[in-house]
Amino acid sequence: MVKSEAMFTVPEFYSRRKQFVGQSSTRLDQCGLRLGMWYWKDETKTLEFKSFTPAIELKEKGKKGKAVHFAEMDSGASERLTDKRFASRDEKAAKALEKRSQQGNVTLDDVKFVALLSLQDTEMQRICSFTTFLRNKNLDSFLMALLYYLSYYLQRLSMEKNPQSRVVGLIEKKEVELVVNKLEDAQKYLAQKYCILVLGLGMADKHHLSCGKEKISDTQKDWKFFESFYTFCTCIAWIVFRRQYLTEIEEEVGRLFRTNMFNIPRRKHEDEASGGEKKRMTLVQFRRMMAKRPAIKKAVDMRSPVLSTLLPSLREKAQHITEKKYVAGIKLQPREENIITDLESVAMPIVGILGEPRNLFNPNTLLPLELEENTKPSGRSSSIVETNNTKIQNTLSLVMSKLASPSTCPK
């Protein structure tokens, strides 16, 4: 029994010894030492070292060591290869982007980018702040409310311009009443969305008091922002309504968001109606003109018509009832005041070019392709148009990169 146990324990001892020697040899190799012996060689008459590790393992280690090092490539060739790869990748990305841009329908984001590009020459000093403001949800709600209002406003203008017969039918009267009622509801809804922007909800960096963080009002920043904002809204409405009714849109936007004292488009229209010439007035005529204007204190405290729809004074209520009594020569019945709680649940109508297929429009200008083909220039002017389209596309990519980056424009 003891003999058999000895027969099994001896191989185990040798295996453990061999394992220990192997571990020690690997540790010595890591330290740069090798196990072996020194001996005298008579042929060369030198003292040489003979390693206990076999030569085959050393060759394998040498091969493994060589495999770690990478062959250096020519720098010029590598740069050319990377340039070709990046060029092919950019070309594929541009084709994919162009293909995606032709799919789907025209959205409000498309109109916002085109309006931003069209204002870059005149309003570029102030418009830089809009790159961070374009993604605001409150802005989208306000713009849709404005377009919703202007669609009914232009419909009402067309009814007023069309000559009505003396005998008005019941259907025509119902149509006028329906448009006027929808216009009134749209103005109240627009006033709610405009108050959100004025109070600075969700846009503290654009608010003149930083939503209560500052104690001193920054009127200069407030004035610059909203003046550019009104121009931006006018441009968006003009693009949506197929670049028509620019004068009507300018006057209505100026009337809604400005008082009569500060309504610049209205003054321009009055100057154009008078011939654009400044007439010399007598002292009596000047006094009569100044008597019609309100005092400075009253002018400062005046509110725009869009704000007075929510909290009108007694005088504004009476004026509104008088103006609404007759529309397009038709006497309207008084309507009970309905409180508009929320119009966001109501489906908004498709306004202008919004909702139409993208492939019918130029992606850079949102002009109908049929209109561009009919008015397509020839010769040298066509190359100028192509150059301008390239510049617009480059600026659009710059705006998209600014929106994608977290950094904002410098003040």
UniProtKB/Swiss-Prot annotation:
* Listed name of the protein: Protein phosphatase 1 regulatory subunit 36
A Pfam family reported for this protein in Swiss-Prot or TrEMBL: PPPI_inhib
Q: How does this protein assemble?
A: Interacts with PPP1CA.
Q: Which GO terms describe its molecular function?
A: phosphatase binding; protein phosphatase inhibitor activity
Protein role: Inhibits phosphatase activity of protein phosphatase 1 (PP1) complexes.
Q: Which gene encodes it?
A: Ppp1r36
Species of origin reads: Mus musculus
- Superkingdom, taxonomy of origin: Eukaryota
Keyword annotations for this protein, in alphabetical order, are: Protein phosphatase inhibitor
